[in-house]
Amino acid sequence: MKNNRKLLFFDIDGTLLTAYPWSIPESTRKALEAARKNGHLLFVNSGRIYAMISPMVKELGFDGYVCGCGSQIYMNNELLFSSSNPNPLCREVIETLRQCRISAFFERPDKILYDGSSKTLPKAIQNLKTEVSVEDLSLYEEETWNTFTFDKFLAFPDKDSDTETFRRFVDEHFSCFIHDDAAWEITQKNYSKATGIQFLADRLGASPEDTFAFGDSTNDLPMLEYAGISIAMGQSDPMILPHCTYQTTSIDEDGIANAMKHFHLI
């Protein structure tokens, strides 16, 4: 690891991208470019699968990506690590969701799956069809049903759902983050945004003290707790603040640039 080189990890939504309609502030673009010129390595660290990362983010020229909450790791356009839930567990998830009357969609590195037999499909599925390949797993023939996998999934309980039974099942097998819009982000228990940082730091010969994490929500907590320096955006969920080194201004108020200047990264 070169002297003074740091590894910088950025969440996407609310950190790099503003709220809808998504955009990247010009101050963020310039700060990332300046940090790269100073020799630092820049990584996206997101709950999104790689296929769902916006082209406007990819155009920023990151050195790598931690995707799917640590289930896929890329560097220099090479896939270094990938982990999916085993097929028997994936089938059990589908069956449990059906029993508990909960709609969901399921994320793979290359596509999104959904259960067309669900009475209430997530509205997000219609939007996703314009962004990424989408597939109805209820149409699978036996061979595909017995081999398909996914990395993580989003569940959308409503007032008619048996959330108590489903939560017991989730807690036994997965990690779960409940978002402000009531979506449950459900990820593999052994992998997180933190394990993604650890993997890349080990590969690059960096210590945790050489890592910076930038985030704004509870699913960023693992990486914020692991990184040597953790930075909360100005509009962050208050729950993450006790776990952060520093709170910068909001994304719309040059938050990324201000944090980088504060820590002399640029």
Feature-to-residue mapping (PLM):
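Residue-level signal for inorganic ion chemistry
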Residues: 35, 46, 153, 224, ...
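Asp-based, Mg2+/Mn2+-dependent phosphohydrolase catalytic module
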Residues: 226, 231-266
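Active-site phosphate-binding/coordination module
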Residues: 27-123
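Short, acidic loop-to-helix structural element flanking the phosphoryl-transfer center
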Residues: 21-40, 83-91, 137-140, 191-202, ...
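Short, structured coil segments at secondary-structure junctions
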Residues: 60-61, 69, 169-173, 226-227, ...
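Conserved acidic, metal-coordinating active-site core of Asp-based
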Residues: 96, 100-103, 107-214, 218-226, ...
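Asp-based phosphoryl-transfer active-site loop
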Residues: 4-21
